Amino acid sequence: SEGFSLYVGIPFCPSICSYCSFSSSPVGEWKDKIDAYLDALIKELKALGRMAGERKPDTVYVGGGTPTTLEAGQLDRLLGTIRNCFDLSELKEFTVEAGRPDSITREKLMALKKNGISRISVNPQTMKQQTLDIIGRHHTVDDTIQSFKLARELGFDNINMDLIMGLPEETLDDVRHTMELVKELAPDNVTIHSLAVKRAARLTIFKDRYSDMQMINTQEH
């Protein structure tokens, strides 16, 4: 009853996926603002640490956006601040959304490992290249596979993978293919989301571009 969960948001991504309605900006356009954002975030974390007093977090989750749009040194600075500001002696899980394979590097994963991250998420959403291109993901299926294998090589033994069902132009056979490839990687957890296109998503804003594409939007049901 005395514990709490801490969520830390990094509102930057390599690119903005067409289905996404989260508050996130393309990192290429905001790269010169990231250090200022981190300065403000760290100031807030220090204040929260003082407010927490003797209370200890049960879980810490660093999400976004895509936290690994930060450079390795920036990740190290952020995670080190969390470790210094809060008593993590009773922490059950420390998760970082490693996220998109096009932002994962050995150096960044090593920074996560150094700071005691116990769980990461590698999120392809689909293992069909055509769909990745349609939804604006600038990575390949093989990038996903290699990023996952790299994380295993570096000793991460609790890896989640996020998938979305109902993406544009995907069939049941495409989903089966995705699941077969994911099964071969043997992640420790798989999170399945159904596509829910909200008003801030590009699929809504530019809906004429996607009007002839088949998709299953659970937001309409």
Where are these regions (language model features)?
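Canonical Radical SAM [4Fe-4S] cluster-binding loop centered on the CxxxCxxC motif
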Residues: 5-36
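Conserved non-cysteine loop/helix-boundary elements of the Radical SAM core domain that shape
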Residues: 24-221
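Flexible, acidic/Gly-rich N-terminal and inter-domain linker regions that tether
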Residues: 1-3
